[in-house]
A protein has these predicted regions:
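Iron-sulfur cluster-binding electron-transfer modules in prokaryotic oxidoreductases
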Residues: 1-164
C-alpha cells in the first residue's frame, strides 16, 4: 500500500484492519498536549468515533498519565539501569488488552513504537547488550503480545481512505 508515514514514525496503511474488523484501542496522553495544554478529550473523541473501535483506558491516563520516556532528552540516550520508561508504558497499555496504542505525539510514537517493536524508535535496538538496562517489554506483557503504536491522524486518514 501507499506509505503515509514521515520520519516521525506515524505509520503506514499496510496491514490496516479492514472495515468491520473490531479494534481495541487505548490512547496515550502525551506530556505536552496533555499535562501542559490540558487537551485530553478531543483525541479520545476522534479515536472513539472511528468505526469498530472500542476505546479502553490505561490505569494511568489524562492528568495522571506517565511519560513515554522521551521527556528531558531521554530519547537520545540509553538507560544504564532499571526499566526503560517506554517499556513500562507499553506493558501498561498491553494490560488493557488493546490491539493499538494511539497517540498524537511523534516523540511518543517513536518511544512507544520502539518498546513495542513497531518502529525503530530513537534508541538502539541492542540497548540490552549495553549493560542489560533494557527490560524486554514482550516478556513482561500479558500473553507476551504488545499493541501496535499508531498516530491518531494516521488512524483517521485510514478510515477516510476506506470510505468510513
Amino acid at each position: 500500500g501507499e506509505d503515509t508515514t514521515d520520519e516521525a514514525g506515524a505509520g503506514s496503511t499496510d496491514g490496516v484492519p479492514q472495515a468491520g474488523a473490531p479494534l481495541k484501542v487505548t490512547y496515550h496522553d502525551a506530556c505536552f498536549l496533555g499535562r501542559h495544554n490540558r487537551v485530553y478529550e478531543p483525541p479520545r473523541e476522534l479515536v472513539g468515533s472511528l468505526p469498530n473501535v472500542e476505546l479502553v483506558e490505561m490505569p494511568r491516563n489524562r492528568d495522571r498519565a506517565m511519560c513515554c520516556g522521551a521527556g528531558g532528552a531521554h530519547a537520545w540516550f540509553e538507560e544504564t539501569r532499571g526499566t526503560r520508561i517506554a517499556d513500562a508504558r507499553i506493558v501498561e497499555a498491553a494490560s488493557t488488552g488493546a490491539d493499538v496504542v494511539a497517540t498524537a505525539c511523534p516523540f511518543c510514537s517513536q518511544m512507544l513504537g520502539s518498546a513495542s517493536g513497531t518502529s525503530a524508535g530513537f534508541v538502539s535496538a541492542n540497548a540490552a547488550d549495553q549493560g542489560g538496562a533494557n527490560t524486554d517489554a514482550t516478556t513482561a506483557s500479558p500473553g507476551g503480545k504488545l499493541p501496535e503504536v499508531r498516530d491518531v491522524a494516521v488512524m483517521l486518514l485510514e478510515a477516510v481512505k476506506r470510505g468510513q
